[in-house]
Amino acid sequence: MRIERDLHMATGDGETSYTKNSRIQEKTMFQIKPVLEEATRAVYTALHPQTMVVADLGCSSGPNTLRFVSEVIGIIARHCKEYGRQHDHTQLQFFLNDLPGNDFNNLFQLIQQFNKSTAINHKSEAAEALPPPCYISGLPGSYYTRIFPSESVHLFHSLFCLQWRSEAPEGNKKTCLDIYITKTMSPSMVKLFQQQFQKDFSLFLRLRYEELVSGGQMVLTFIGRKHENVFTGESNHLYGLLAQSLKSLVDEGLVEKEKLESFYLPMYSPSVGEVEAILKQVGLFNMNHVKVFQTNWDPYDDLESDVVHNSIRSGENVAKCLRAVMQPLVASQFGEPILDKLFKEYARRVAKHLENEKTKHAIIVLSIEKAIHL
């Protein structure tokens, strides 16, 4: 498994694609709109850039990417109208960044359609709040490296990306077949997951500090956990069920045990406390906002109740969403022929889990500003 090659969402627009199975990301985008608006307005008001540079890190492909672009355009248009600045002649430059395996071809086709319709849409939504000119470019590369010149970006955004690590921890599983943190995992292995997060997030902050202009901000949204106890995270259940599904294929002789023994997910879902500790240690950013909110595993279940009314359907929905995210990674390790059977088994196990416990994702949204050091 090579992270830069294999870590990307399922491509295309078929039934198992990320484009068709990214409703959780869409719902989360709606939840964080007030945070994004506050940060965007603050940067624009403080800096009044002639060209405002905005970067979406880990953009993937599909409509959610352009929802973010559209949202920022709308925020600037409304702000200019409210404060009589329609003639500021501000331009927006968007950079959409992801690893090279991302479906940039699909994304560029969507951008072409978006460019044709954006002026009409914003004119109808905001009367005289005409959108500023915008320019959109793709930018392949890892956000765990430098990807922009020094002090060139005004606003960074990232949605559902910073739970991904730059590499998976390496270790001998010996007696267990876990792929993510569980209570049966050795303390030394758990520590490797935590250390990789600390290393990656610290590096990410230092890199972005160099690339942000003075007064620039970041809005970062990623899967975390509600509690400090590393064994009680919601992700533990989600990926534990995937590990069980893979083990069932080992028992059937469809997956080699050695391949599962050597497979760890390059992920870590931190607590707010862990995030704040690294921010304090790095010391390069001021925190404007931090919040944890929850959303149901099943992206089509919008009910607040503690009961899943159709566990079979919810299991299938959860499996489709996870497959859209995990398919390339799983296929690189175990081969494509097992995918249908694996995620069918996973849907069954998720349904059984949801019969007993309605589980939610814990999502952290963080707004931070580049600190000024005199």
UniProtKB/Swiss-Prot annotation:
InterPro entries, A to Z: MeTrfase_7, MeTrfase_capping, SAM-dependent_MTases_sf
Which keywords appear in this protein's UniProt record, sorted alphabetically? Magnesium, Metal-binding, Methyltransferase, Plant defense, S-adenosyl-L-methionine, Transferase
EC number assigned by the record: 2.1.1.277
Q: Which residues bind anthranilate?
A: 25, 164
**Biological processes per GO annotation:** defense response; methylation
**Superkingdom:** Eukaryota
GO: which molecular function terms?
Answer: S-adenosylmethionine-dependent methyltransferase activity
Per its record, the protein catalyses: anthranilate + S-adenosyl-L-methionine = O-methyl anthranilate + S-adenosyl-L-homocysteine
Q: Give the induction text.
A: Slightly up-regulated by herbivory and jasmonic acid, but not by salicylic acid.
Please tell me where Mg(2+) binds in this chain: 261, 263
Q: What Pfam families does the annotation carry?
A: Methyltransf_7 (PF03492)
List of residues binding S-adenosyl-L-homocysteine:
18, 59, 64, 98-99, 142-143
- Give the family this protein belongs to, as stated in its UniProt record: Belongs to the methyltransferase superfamily. Type-7 methyltransferase family. SABATH subfamily.
**Annotated protein name in UniProt:** Anthranilate O-methyltransferase 2
Q: Which organism is it from?
A: Zea mays
